[in-house]
């Protein structure tokens, strides 16, 4: 996963304008709770359930080329690197299927098959849609700009990194290591 491969698939990212200001990769704000209509690989999970852990979120769509070439393999890679921390309950990986296009194709049944084929074993939530809204609720709350988009949340529940599209994986890995080393404290 080197920056040299970025040019090969940057045009493949799925983009949507949500009318929110662009987020920087280092913006610090409280992570909003997600709104999930259905879970795969989990009986149900809230952000509050993960308090005290570093949380890595992949906002994706099953038909997104950038997700299939970058964020999904990166999640697998990080799960291997941080396997012991995951077993120790210090880090959690979550994917959120944020469908803002191709609704008739990206149905839950197809997603369940996709998750199995891609060997995704961590919790996968299907972002809930509000009546009459094109964009799903969690996508709006996190102000994501498309897919793939990844977020890293610290132990206190603050977004410490959020990036649309490609980014240097080593940067994310270093941040995860830093956050794992931080003491769990009160609200910041």
Predicted regions and their residues:
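Structural microenvironment flanking redox-active thiols in thiol-disulfide oxidoreductases
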Residues: 68-118, 129-138
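Alpha/beta-hydrolase fold active-site loops
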Residues: 54-55, 91, 148
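Thiol/disulfide oxidoreductase modules built on the thioredoxin-like
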Residues: 118-120, 126-175
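Short active-site neighborhood of thiol/selenol oxidoreductases, capturing the structured segment around
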Residues: 45-68
């Amino acid at each position: 996963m080197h920056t040299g491969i970025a040019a090969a698939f940057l045009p493949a990212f799925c983009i949507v304008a949500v009318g929110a200001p662009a987020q920087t990769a280092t913006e610090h704000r409280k992570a909003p709770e997600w709104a999930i209509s259905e879970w795969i690989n989990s009986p149900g999970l809230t952000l509050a359930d993960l308090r005290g852990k570093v949380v890595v979120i992949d906002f994706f769509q099953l038909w997104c080329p950038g997700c299939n070439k970058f964020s999904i393999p990166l999640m697998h890679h990080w799960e291997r690197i941080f396997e012991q921390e995951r077993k120790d309950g210090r880090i959690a990986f979550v994917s959120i299927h944020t469908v803002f296009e191709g609704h008739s194709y990206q149905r839950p049944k197809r997603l369940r098959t996709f998750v199995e084929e891609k060997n995704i074993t961590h919790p996968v939530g299907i972002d809930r849609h509000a009546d009459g809204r094109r964009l799903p609720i969690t996508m709006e709350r996190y102000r994501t700009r498309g897919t793939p988009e990844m977020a890293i949340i610290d132990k206190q529940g603050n977004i410490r990194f959020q990036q649309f599209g490609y980014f240097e994986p080593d940067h994310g890995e270093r941040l995860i290591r830093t956050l794992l080393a931080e003491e769990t404290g009160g609200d910041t």
